[in-house]
Amino acid sequence: GLSAEQKTALKDSWKILAANGETMVKNSAAMFGLLFEKYPDTKKHFKTFDGDHFAAMKATGMGKAHGMSVFSGLGALVSSVDDGECVLGLAKKLSRNHTARGVTANDFKLMRSIFGEFLDKATGGKATESMKSAWDALLGVLIENHQ
């Protein structure tokens, strides 16, 4: 499970990442933008959006809705970090939803690999090493439970 320090770091970082709805939409678009910049092949999972770029995530209702949905899911994980069974249940639900869309554990690993850089950008350089390692651990739980 996650340590007390990791749980606190997740909660503290979430206050920055998801301060309000506008911030959540902006940060989710930035997160996916970085993923697609580093790993263009991951765009194949998003047939709703233009295959060449992901500006549509910020510009369209569908894009904003997906970003908000992803960040709401992350928020549920952060809100549940003190309940290990709930975190595992959420991880398994997320896995089922993504497996149905052809998203693999390797795709989750790619997201995990860019998350520290995303945190730096989204927090304006205020992400601590504790925050980065806590998110890495939480994303590790998602990967371990991806079937």
From Swiss-Prot:
Single GO MF descriptor: metal ion binding
Family: Belongs to the globin family.
Protein's recorded name: Globin
Residue stretches spanning the membrane: none
Keywords, sorted A to Z: Heme, Iron, Metal-binding, Muscle protein, Oxygen transport, Transport
Organism lineage string: Eukaryota, Metazoa, Spiralia, Lophotrochozoa, Mollusca
Subunit structure of this chain's protein: Homodimer.
GO CC entries: extracellular region; hemoglobin complex
Binding, heme b: H66, H98
PROSITE patterns assigned: GLOBIN (PS01033)
Domain of life: Eukaryota
Signal sequence coordinates: none
Domain Globin stretches: 1-147
Leftover remarks: In contrast to the other dimeric myoglobins, N.mutabilis myoglobin is a highly cooperative oxygen binding molecule.
Cross-referenced PANTHER family: GLOBIN-LIKE PROTEIN
Matching InterPro entries: Erythrocruorin (IPR002336), Globin (IPR000971), Globin-like_sf (IPR009050), Globin/Proto (IPR012292), Mb-like_M (IPR044399)
CDD domains xref list: Mb-like
